[in-house]
Design a protein with these regions (language model features):
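Beta-strand signatures of extracellular beta-sandwich domains
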Residues: 4-6, 30-34, 127-129
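Short beta-strand-plus-loop segments that form exposed binding edges in beta-rich domains
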Residues: 6-9, 112-121
Length: 169
């Protein structure tokens, strides 16, 4: 189980986004998830631990795993996930929970996207989906999962082409 966060291009954003900067980038510093069947959320009691992160593309120095490392400092002192220089394109971040989440009746989910890299490095258009299932790689081949664990700048041409073909499909 986990979350899928899709950042989406939009004509209303500079460079078609998906971020709000002039060039379309964003920095997602931290993602937190909470679940409860009660009316109010207790940050300590209802927090769901996110233990895995991967993305279809990561900016050098800003990998997917940084979106769940808990470091929420502002600007370059912080960490996060970013997608430069692939602006104007849809991207996805898949987060997995450390253990399955038991859903009973009407469970409320709260997802917090923390974005502290200046005033414009925020996501302009996005979609969040809750994921269920046993495999964190549902819908993504093991070859692609393995490639996504490699920093973008360290991938060879064949690996980059495999990701491009997946993205294009």
């Amino acid at each position: 189980t986990g979350l899928k966060i899709e950042t989406l291009p939009d004509k209303s954003l500079n460079a078609n986004g998906p971020g709000r900067t002039d060039h379309g980038n964003f920095v997602l510093n931290d993602v937190r998830m909470y679940a409860t069947d009660q009316e109010k959320f207790d940050a300590k009691k209802h927090r769901i631990t996110l233990s895995g992160a991967r993305a279809d593309f990561t900016q050098t120095g800003w990998p997917a795993k940084n979106a769940i490392d808990g470091k929420i400092n502002e600007g370059k002192k912080g960490t996060g996930w970013a997608v430069g220089p692939q602006y104007g394109k849809a991207h996805q971040l898949i987060l997995t929970t450390s253990k399955p989440v038991a859903i009973k009746g009407s469970t409320r989910l709260q997802v917090v996207l923390d974005q502290q890299y200046g005033s414009k490095h925020t996501i302009g258009c996005f979609r969040i989906s809750a994921r269920t299932g046993q495999s964190p790689g549902d819908g993504i081949s093991q070859q692609i999962v393995k490639i996504l664990t490699i920093e973008a700048g360290e991938r060879d041409d064949k690996q980059a082409e495999a990701l491009f073909n997946l993205f294009r499909s």
